[in-house]
């Protein structure tokens, strides 16, 4: 199975731009890979929320929204599975979720982040987390997703360790300075990933509308046995295809 880690650019609050970026990559990689993986909250952008539910309920979308349907149609048309982060609205709650669509355009997994680090501490019950990890099948592989901070909790490592899968997908939004990631932080992530005792595919997005030194600047890697088996560095947009 070929998995392409898309460490590419997004714009906060520009869901149309981000949707078109996903669909453009689906078209570009038709016949070249089996799964395209994008980072956490890629569809709306990580910093798109105000933490006022009356405002944010119009930014978050349900998995049945037309924007999701458009991406499903592209996946079906180009026979390519895709997984991307989005800010999900379900009933009266908002989640940081990762949606995976197979190459027939069918949603096969909608994972809700279980750790609270995606939101500020002062939020009310409208901002929520999921409660468990799920195993799903794509092609001939069984897959588990953990979003960003999920994999830094011992309890979550234990939960995943009790589940059987071929690999773990680790979409994130991290805002390390790109030099810090390239020189030090990636090794800490490789070590943490080794606790899962299976290949872990990491991808971070690239923020196009914020120019601070400590902001998401891409980067993607295959971690296995505490090692970085393959990678593209942080600091510029890029994609890397991993064969599992």
PLM segments and residue spans:
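Active-site catalytic loop in hydrolytic enzyme cores
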Residues: 89-163, 177-187, 244
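Short beta-strand scaffold segments in enzyme catalytic cores
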Residues: 84-86, 97-100, 134, 218-222, ...
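Cys-nucleophile CN-hydrolase/nitrilase-fold catalytic domain and related Cys-dependent amidase chemistry
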Residues: 24-103, 175-198
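Structural motif
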Residues: 34-35, 143, 166-167
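Short Pro/Gly-enriched beta-strand edge/turn motifs at strand-loop
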Residues: 80-86, 112-121, 200-206
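N-terminal glycine-/serine-/threonine-rich phosphate-binding loop
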Residues: 1-35
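CN hydrolase (nitrilase-like) catalytic-core segments centered on the catalytic cysteine
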Residues: 60-81, 152-239
């Amino acid at each position: 199975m070929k998995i392409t880690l898309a460490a590419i650019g997004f714009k906060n609050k520009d869901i149309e731009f981000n949707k078109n970026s996903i669909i453009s990559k689906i078209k570009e990689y038709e016949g070249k890979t089996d799964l395209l993986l994008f980072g956490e909250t890629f569809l709306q952008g990580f910093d798109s929320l105000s933490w006022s539910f009356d405002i944010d309920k119009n930014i978050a979308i349900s998995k049945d929204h037309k924007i999701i349907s458009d991406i499903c149609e592209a996946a079906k048309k180009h026979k390519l599975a895709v997984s991307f982060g989005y800010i999900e609205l379900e009933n009266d709650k908002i989640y940081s979720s990762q949606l995976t669509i197979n190459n027939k355009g069918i949603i096969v997994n909608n994972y809700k982040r279980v750790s609270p680090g995606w939101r500020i501490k002062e939020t009310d019950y409208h901002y929520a987390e999921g409660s468990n990890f799920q195993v799903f099948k794509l092609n001939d592989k069984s897959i588990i997703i953990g979003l960003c901070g999920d994999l830094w909790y011992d309890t979550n490592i234990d939960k995943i360790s009790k589940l059987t899968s071929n690999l773990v997908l680790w979409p994130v939004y991290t805002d390390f300075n790109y030099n810090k990631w390239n020189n030090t932080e990636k090794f800490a992530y490789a070590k943490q990933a080794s606790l899962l005792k299976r290949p872990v595919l990491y991808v971070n997005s690239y923020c196009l509308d914020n120019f601070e030194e400590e902001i998401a600047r891409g980067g993607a890697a295959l971690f296995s046995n505490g090692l970085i088996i393959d990678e593209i560095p942080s600091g510029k947009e890029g994609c890397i295809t991993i064969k599992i």
